[in-house]
UniProtKB/Swiss-Prot annotation:
Its biological purpose: The steroid hormones and their receptors are involved in the regulation of eukaryotic gene expression and affect cellular proliferation and differentiation in target tissues.
GO molecular function: estrogen response element binding; nuclear estrogen receptor activity; nuclear receptor activity; steroid binding; zinc ion binding
Keywords, sorted A to Z: DNA-binding, Lipid-binding, Metal-binding, Nucleus, Receptor, Steroid-binding, Transcription, Transcription regulation, Zinc, Zinc-finger
SMART domains: HOLI (SM00430), ZnF_C4 (SM00399)
SUBUNIT field: Binds DNA as a homodimer. Can form a heterodimer with ER-beta.
Source organism of this protein record: Xenopus laevis (African clawed frog)
Residue ranges, annotated region (Disordered): 144-173, 252-276, 543-569
Domain NR LBD, chain residue ranges per copy: 303-539
Chain spans, region Hinge: 246-302
Composition-biased stretches (Basic and acidic residues): 149-160, 265-276, 543-556
GO cellular component assignments: chromatin; cytoplasm; nucleus
PROSITE patterns registered for this protein in UniProt: NR_LBD, NUCLEAR_REC_DBD_1, NUCLEAR_REC_DBD_2
Protein's name according to its UniProt entry: Estrogen receptor
Length: 586
């Protein structure tokens, strides 16, 4: 059988037949088939059947379960100028970023929905095209449209979450949320005694380390919260103190081994009357090795309240003047009144000093030495304290108030008078309290003879270390009272410094008063009593210009004998019984 030779007409006719067959295939009714595996998720619409055409000419129909599908009318086939693809095809998106297939068209990025398996089981699947071929793949999680790096991060988070679910609960899940006690922001930790945020912690640290003279522009009642905490520094600092912030604040539930050891040592120290130098060093007190065999004062076992109470009970009684208000004051009469008052107050001052806690534990030599160095300073600070309630006047006694004009009758007294009135004004401005006054007076007694410079005839102290220990105890009591009064830490430090600075002015006034009193003695203006005269001789100031005069006076005056370092006029105030008791305790 011979085949006819193909010609151009026959080829064209054959091509038309193929195209007609393809068009017939496209227009035939869709054939429903069952797949071995269900297809994946597709974006469907209006709960209709979605028709998908394949190059083989077979059409598959998938019914969506209560999910919208594309209608057949919405799908179109655009003729391609190239085989299996054209640049004119739009709206086609594949999952593996390959050239789009000319068969499947989607209007926008699909959000896949699960199809119903032919057995009724709902399993997600999706279609994948590879160079014109199609395969049914198992659908990935809804985030499979992300990039590969996002997929890796997502899978890593899923593995971490699954591991956390299997393991014990994490610290973040069990950590209790704390809020700042000042501004109610999230607290970063326990700072300065309260739960606070980093901002309030840093603000309080700056305030206690530097200057905090903040002024509120309003009424000191500004609202301090997370948003308005920076609006008013004064009110913010006030609230920090109100909620309990303090320097060195620690959590009470954090008690490490070091704190427990310190507490145990403190309890052992309170049970013992004998304190060794190592325990004194823990209290920040340096002790000489020569103190090892010394029995220290029981004042160390006293609390601040007990020490204040003992000092209040030791206060001397009120001394009245013999002044007759009907008679005018002259230089001689005024000096007689003042020296008489001073002599009687000296007796009470010695009794007061012996009742100061720890003073009688010193040697007799040191007791006399301290009294001879501090007697005029103690009398002057008592005069200043009595004059606080009388502005512009000095209250030498309840019945003897003198102003500046009355002090002019005595030569050289006006300068000392003005300094005393100025110091009384300073006490009044500071609103000095009685507890602070008695502590200051005790500090003057114990501190005056530590650095002797008024007389070259006085010997050095014997129990300097013990004097420092008692002095530190009284200073600690003063600080404790300031803290108890409600002052902030910076206010306590400032007030303590101001009070201690006043002591130097009192020392200066004492030196001026000693010079004036000694000049009155040399002029024989007024007779001095034995006790006052002895105290004055102990404070004679030696200068180059009057050194020869002083030596002549010393040669004319008979030598004074002392017993155990006590001056003759002070010996009646230290009986033999007291001397024996003092020596037994040292």
């Amino acid at each position: 059988m011979t085949m006819p030779l193909p010609n151009k007409t026959t080829g064209v006719t054959f091509l038309h037949q193929i195209q007609s067959s393809e068009l017939e295939t496209l227009t035939r009714p869709p054939l429903k088939i069952s797949l071995e595996r269900p297809l994946g998720e597709m974006y469907v619409e209006n709960n209709r059947t979605g028709i998908f055409n394949y190059p083989e000419g077979t059409t598959y129909d998938f019914a969506a379960a209560a999910a919208p599908v594309y209608s057949s009318a919405s799908l179109s086939y655009a003729a391609s100028s190239e085989t299996f693809g054209s640049s004119s095809l739009t709206g086609l998106h594949t999952l593996n970023n390959v050239p789009p297939s000319p068969v499947v068209f989607l209007a926008k990025l699909p959000q896949l929905s699960p199809f119903i398996h032919h057995h009724g089981q709902q399993v997600p699947y999706y279609l994948e095209s590879e160079q014109g071929t199609f395969a049914v793949r198992e659908a990935a999680p809804p985030t499979f449209y992300r990039s590969s790096s996002d997929n890796r991060r997502q899978s890593g988070r899923e593995r971490m979450s699954s591991a956390n679910d299997k393991g014990p609960p994490s610290m973040e899940s069990t950590k209790e949320t704390r809020y700042c006690a000042v501004c109610s922001d999230y607290a970063s930790g326990y700072h300065y005694g309260v739960w606070s945020c980093e901002g309030c912690k840093a603000f309080f640290k700056r305030s206690i380390q530097g200057h905090n003279d903040y002024m509120c522009p309003a009424t000191n009642q500004c609202t301090i919260d997370k948003n308005r905490r920076k609006s008013c520094q004064a009110c913010r600092l006030r609230k920090c103190y109100e909620v309990g912030m303090m320097k060195g604040g620690i959590r009470k539930d954090r008690r490490g081994g070091r704190l427990l050891k310190h507490k145990r040592q403190k309890e052992e120290q309170e049970q013992k009357n004998d304190v060794d130098p190592s325990e004194i060093r823990t209290a920040s007190i340096w002790v000489n090795p020569s103190v090892k065999s010394m029995k220290l004062s029981p004042v160390l076992s006293l609390t601040a309240e007990q020490l204040i109470s003992a000092l209040m009970e030791a206060e001397a009684p009120i001394v009245y003047s013999e002044h007759d208000s009907t008679k005018p004051l002259s230089e001689a009469s005024m000096m007689t009144l003042l020296t008489n008052l001073a002599d009687r107050e000296l007796v009470h001052m010695i009794n007061w000093a012996k009742r100061v806690p720890g003073f009688v534990d010193l040697t007799l030599h040191d007791q006399v030495h301290l009294l001879e160095c501090a007697w005029l300073e103690i009398l002057m600070v008592g005069l200043i304290w009595r004059s606080v309630e009388h502005p512009g006047k000095l209250s030498f006694a309840p019945n003897l108030l003198l102003d500046r004009n009355q002090g002019r009758c005595v030569e050289g007294l006006v300068e000392i008078f003005d300094m005393l009135v100025t110091t009384a004004t300073r006490f009044r401005m500071m609103r000095l309290r009685g507890e602070e006054f008695i502590c200051l007076k005790s500090i003057i007694l114990l501190n005056s003879g530590v650095y002797t410079f008024l007389s070259s005839t006085l010997e050095s102290l014997e129990d300097t270390d013990l004097i420092h220990i008692i002095l530190d105890k009284i200073i600690d009591t003063l600080v404790h009272f300031m803290a108890k009064s409600g002052l902030s830490l910076q206010q306590q430090q400032r007030r303590l410094a101001q009070l201690l600075l006043i002591l130097s002015h009192i020392r200066h006034m004492s030196n001026k008063g000693m010079e004036h009193l000694y000049s009155m003695k040399c002029k024989n203006v007024v007779p001095l009593y034995d006790l006052l005269l002895e105290m004055l001789d102990a404070h004679r100031i030696h200068t180059p210009k009057d050194k020869t005069t002083t030596q002549e006076e010393d040669s004319r005056s008979p030598p004074t004998t002392t017993v155990n370092g006590a001056s003759p006029c002070l010996q009646p105030y230290y009986t033999n019984t007291e001397e024996v008791s003092l020596q037994s305790t040292v």
